[in-house]
From Swiss-Prot:
Function of the molecule: Converts heme B (protoheme IX) to heme O by substitution of the vinyl group on carbon 2 of heme B porphyrin ring with a hydroxyethyl farnesyl side group.
Keywords: Cell inner membrane, Cell membrane, Heme biosynthesis, Membrane, Transferase, Transmembrane, Transmembrane helix
Family matches, as InterPro entries: GPCR_Rhodpsn_7TM (IPR017452), Protohaem_IX_farnesylTrfase (IPR006369), UbiA_prenyltransferase (IPR000537), UbiA_prenylTrfase_CS (IPR030470), UbiA_sf (IPR044878)
Pathway(s) of this molecule: Porphyrin-containing compound metabolism; heme O biosynthesis; heme O from protoheme: step 1/1
Gene Ontology CC: plasma membrane
Name of the featured protein: Protoheme IX farnesyltransferase
Tagged with keyword GTP-binding: no
Compartments where found: Cell inner membrane
Gene expressing this chain: ctaB
Length: 300
């Protein structure tokens, strides 16, 4: 019996497959955090020329972040196929070949790096490329399959967007950018461990040494609580350093108290539903915190 002929894929469907490789929702948050870094680096409203630089910088960061996401899909296609939340990815479903995905990733990386180098500044390009290497190679290939601390160490790459944004506008990496980096770095572990808690069986089947798999639920929940407490303190630093004023402080305290509350509840009385709510609130926490920084920046 002869094999069935391959199913033709329309151009729009193929484009959607390539777009899905870039993990658009993740990249949107990355670009948003980079944008906050750009805007905070500029006193007052950006000029027309600065808005142009912001646009090019956002485009460059989006392209390189998308390239890293696509490369990640190649490396983790076997793992993605075993996990419900990632089984839809085109590489996991066999809709795109490794060669197609690798070429797509390379094109995005080259295009984004060129935009940043020629239309923003070389420092931003090199920092963005280092972030690509940190995520795609050091985190995805080395840390993630090796250690349950993968999220902690690899979180440095995920915390880079505001640093990239700051460098894009100032051609330097100031202490303000490092404060923003620290906030995201400390936010990352409780965010991902909350997800891993209610997806623990999927991670166990995938073979990834996530903390709930290697150290159990109780230990992971304690770590979530501890990190939310440390994060609460870190989120006060923009006010202490003079980057922001009282409106931001009020937002930071409320959001931090909410995240700590979820962490405490999760530690005391676990349920998958509560872990899912904690994960979702973590997204609200980071987005609202950076939005508060932005609004505070323009208050008289």
């Amino acid at each position: 019996m002869s094999a069935a002929p391959p199913v033709a894929v329309s151009a729009p469907s193929r484009l959607r497959q390539f777009y899905a490789l870039t993990k658009p929702r993740v990249v949107q948050l990355i670009v948003f955090c980079a944008l906050i870094g750009m805007v905070l680096a500029v006193p007052g409203l950006p000029s027309a020329a600065q808005w142009g630089r912001i646009a090019w910088a956002c485009a460059g960061v989006w392209l390189v972040a998308g390239a890293a996401a696509a490369f990640n899909c190649i490396v983790e296609q076997g793992i993605d196929a075993k996990m419900k939340r990632t089984a839809w990815r085109p590489t996991a479903r066999g809709e795109l070949s490794n060669a197609q995905t690798l070429l797509f990733s390379a094109l995005l990386c080259v295009a984004g790096s060129a935009l940043l180098y020629f239309l923003v500044n070389p420092l931003t390009m090199w920092l963005t490329f280092a972030t690509f290497v940190g995520y795609a190679v050091i985190y995805t290939l080395i840390l993630k399959p090796l250690t349950p601390q993968n999220i902690v160490i690899g979180g440095a790459s995920g915390a880079m967007p505001p640093v990239l944004g700051w460098a894009a506008m100032t051609n330097t990496v100031g202490p303000e950018a490092l404060i923003l980096f620290l906030i995201i770095f400390l936010w990352t572990p409780p965010h991902f461990w909350a997800l891993a808690l209610y997806r623990v069986e999927e991670y166990r089947q995938s073979g990834l040494p996530m903390l709930p798999v290697t150290h159990g639920s109780a230990f992971t929940r304690l770590q979530v609580l501890l990190y939310t407490l440390i994060l609460f303190a870190a989120c006060l630093m923009p006010f202490i350093y003079g980057m922001s004023s009282w409106p931001y402080l009020a937002a930071a305290v409320l959001l931090g108290a909410g995240f700590c509350g979820y962490g405490f509840a999760l530690w005391r009385n676990y349920s998958d539903a509560l872990a899912r709510k904690t994960f979702r609130f973590s997204l609200i926490h980071l987005s609202a915190l950076f939005a508060a920084l932005l609004l505070d920046h323009y208050l008289p």
